[in-house]
C-alpha cells in the first residue's frame, strides 16, 4: 500500500481563533502516537491567522480510516465544527 498525504485546512470564525487553535494543537500529540502515522503537523498562515493547515502523512488508507474513527479525532471535529467557516480536506499521493 502507498502512503496517503493529507492537507486539511480549517478557517476559524474571527472570534473563535484561539479556541480552534487550542483544539487543533490538542489533537497533534494523540495523532502522532497512532499506528501508521508518519507525520502530523499543524501550521498557521502568516498572513491570515484564522487559517490553520494540518499536513499529515499516513502509512496507508487503512491508517487514515482508523484515525478518522478515534475518540480524539471525533472530539476535535465536534469541538470545532460550529467554530469554523470552512473545513477542507484533500487526500493525495506523492508522485515525485
Segments predicted by a language model, with ranges:
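Short amphipathic alpha-helical segments
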Residues: 16-38, 72-76, 80
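Short, well-ordered beta-strand segments in beta-rich or mixed alpha/beta enzyme
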Residues: 4-10, 41-68, 90
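Glycine-rich beta-strand-turn "strand-cap" elements at beta-sheet edges
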Residues: 2, 42-48, 77-96
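Short beta->alpha connector loops
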Residues: 70-71, 96
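Localized chelating/binding microdomains
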Residues: 25, 54, 85
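Beta-strand elements of well-folded, non-transmembrane domains
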Residues: 12-14
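N-terminal hydrophobic or amphipathic segments with adjacent small-residue motifs
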Residues: 2-4, 9, 25, 30
